[in-house]
Amino acid sequence: MLKQFIRISARMLAGLAALVLTLSTPAARAERPVLKYKDQITVKAPPQKTWDSFKTFDAIHTWHPATEGTKLLVGQNGKALAVREFRIKGGDAFVISELLAFDEAKKWFRYRIIKTNLPLSNYVGEMRVKSAPGGGSVVLWSATFQRPEENPKPDQDDAATEKLVQGVFKAGLDNIAALNSK
């Protein structure tokens, strides 16, 4: 009886291993690839002035034209683990994000979205300022993210998610340049 039990258990284990291997292949599931997007803009102002115009974590509404009502929920500006919330103008969309790292000397910060009703997930972004060749500065904005669902609606596929992030970056970078062109 014990030998029979061991044989059945071994067959079940082999079958379970085969099932796990089958389900872990890309063809067996609709994977959500990690998407990447980056953009930059050259600004006439020196790096410090440009950095000062967008570095305050709970003041995104002062430089991004699509946002309003930013408030700090946890922590302090310029300190890791600070959490902010802001709304998107003209609707009920919101974003709650967490500051992961901030470096005043290097003019750089990293953040992640922890909750949103926008159609994206697992978003981690970075913003930085560098000196531009010949004067001025360059603002670099990059992010990794995923579409919200494994089997997305047509308007929430990878291309739509990338287009959303591209629009957010363009509007923000263009406004940073406008604020620093004087």
Task: Give names to the regions the model predicted.
Residues 26-76:
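Hydrophobic ligand-binding cavity/cleft-lining segments
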Residues 33, 119-126:
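Amphipathic hydrophobic-ligand
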Residues 42, 61-62, 71-119, 171-182:
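Glycine-rich portal/gate segments that line the openings of hydrophobic small-molecule binding cavities
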